[in-house]
């Protein structure tokens, strides 16, 4: 019995570049992105200067095996001045994060072949 979970649809290059015919898709294509995504993700920092841990740019770090250590290190960095950081603030947190990365190899390429 064939699975009905997935369906492969093939189209030619010409079909791909044809005008959109579906009314809903036409409406969606002509909609302002801010209306489609009303909670547009602002990036790594929110408007009030807080850390946006939901940003796609840090989401993989937060969700990694070293996510706790990452959050500790970045929170420390954001709550201390450049001068305090130069004086050694956040060193413990950063080292804890780096030790976790080294220990778990959570940012490896997934390529097990030795070169």
Swiss-Prot record:
This is Uncharacterized protein F42H10.2. The keyword Oxidoreductase does not apply. One of its GO terms (biological process) is protein import into mitochondrial intermembrane space. One of its GO terms (cellular component) is mitochondrial intermembrane space. A motif (Cx9C motif 2) lies at residues 90-100. Residues 63-108 form the CHCH domain. A motif (Cx9C motif 1) lies at residues 66-76. It comes from Caenorhabditis elegans. Disulfide bonds join 66-100, 76-90. The lineage of its organism: Eukaryota, Metazoa, Ecdysozoa, Nematoda, Chromadorea.
């Amino acid at each position: 019995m064939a699975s009905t979970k997935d369906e492969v649809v093939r189209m030619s290059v010409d079909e791909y570049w044809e005008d959109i015919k579906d009314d809903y898709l036409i409406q969606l294509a002509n909609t302002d992105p801010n209306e489609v995504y009303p909670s547009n993700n602002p990036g790594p920092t929110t408007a009030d200067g807080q850390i946006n841990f939901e940003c796609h740019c840090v989401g993989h770090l937060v969700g990694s095996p070293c996510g706790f250590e990452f959050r500790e290190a970045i929170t420390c960095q954001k709550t201390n001045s450049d001068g305090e950081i130069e004086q050694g603030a956040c060193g413990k947190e950063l080292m804890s994060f780096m030790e976790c990365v080294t220990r778990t190899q959570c940012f490896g390429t997934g390529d097990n072949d030795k070169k």
